[in-house]
């Protein structure tokens, strides 16, 4: 469904080289030490940066000529990126139309997405009136209204306390199932990876060194770099 084929990206003296296959409907935890290239991989997929060679395809269609908003994916960051002067409803509506010229059908999509993530009673509030967990739910609703099949998560739970973190994991588990999403999730938490992911990809030294089912992470023979990483983050 989603493939990085001999993708190369250079940042100053660092050369990133990615080969990765993601099956439709899978949830892939992107693991690896800081600076290894995890967020770089997501940025390449999202179209925020361009590779110098190789191809990135979704359903056998190259994404390289498409602008970020044209790609069949949405992205949830560690920082929720809500606009302080816009209401919750308007922040969600940006996922449909950036100019916020919303018709009744659009407003229904906003209400439906807000209900799915549990913020339908907060639609008229401003971000400053929300808790951290509520802000992240609003950002997730903005992803949902885009109705795109691939969801990218870049350490979305790292700023949340343990209770809110667990609530978000349960919520995203339900949304993955109901919306039939394919997910790539950058995380440093093995607990989050085991809770959400069906597969993993381990990035080290700017390459994908290992990938497989999450159930194999602690049982199969693996590169020494992955063994060392797992011991460090336990």
Curated annotation (Swiss-Prot):
- Its transmembrane ranges are none
- One term of GO molecular function: ATP hydrolysis activity
Q: What does this protein do?
A: Part of the ABC transporter complex ThiBPQ involved in thiamine import. Responsible for energy coupling to the transport system.
Kindly provide the name given to this protein in its UniProt entry.
Answer: Thiamine import ATP-binding protein ThiQ
Q: Name one GO cellular component term.
A: plasma membrane
Q: Which InterPro entries match?
A: AAA+_ATPase, ABC_SmlMolc_Importer, ABC_transporter-like_ATP-bd, ABC_transporter-like_CS, P-loop_NTPase, Thiamine_ABC_ThiQ
Q: Which reaction does it catalyse?
A: thiamine(out) + ATP + H2O = thiamine(in) + ADP + phosphate + H(+)
Protein's cellular compartments: Cell inner membrane
Q: What class of enzyme is it?
A: translocase
Q: Which residues are ATP-binding?
A: 32-39
């Amino acid at each position: 469904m989603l493939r990085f084929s001999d993708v190369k990206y250079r940042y100053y003296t660092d050369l990133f080289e990615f080969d990765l296959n993601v099956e439709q409907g899978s949830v892939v935890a992107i693991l690896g030490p800081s600076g290894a290239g995890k967020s770089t991989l997501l940025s390449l997929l999202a179209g925020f940066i361009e590779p110098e060679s190789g191809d990135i395809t979704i359903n056998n269609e190259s994404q390289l000529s498409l602008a970020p908003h044209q790609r069949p994916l949405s992205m949830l960051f560690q920082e929720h990126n809500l606009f302080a002067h816009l209401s919750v409803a308007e922040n969600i509506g940006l996922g449909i139309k950036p100019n916020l010229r919303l018709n009744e059908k659009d407003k229904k999509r906003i209400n439906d997405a807000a209900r799915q993530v549990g913020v339908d009673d907060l639609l008229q509030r401003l971000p400053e009136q929300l808790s951290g967990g509520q802000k992240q739910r609003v950002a997730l609703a903005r992803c949902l209204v885009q109705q795109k099949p691939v969801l990218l998560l870049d350490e979305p739970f790292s700023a949340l306390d343990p209770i809110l973190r667990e609530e978000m994991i349960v919520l995203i588990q339900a949304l993955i199932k109901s919306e039939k999403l394919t997910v790539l999730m950058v995380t440093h938490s093995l607990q989050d990876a085991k809770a959400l992911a069906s597969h993993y990809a381990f990035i080290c030294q700017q390459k994908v060194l290992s990938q497989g089912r999450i159930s194999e992470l602690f049982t199969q023979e693996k590169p020494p770099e992955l063994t060392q990483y797992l011991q460090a983050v336990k």
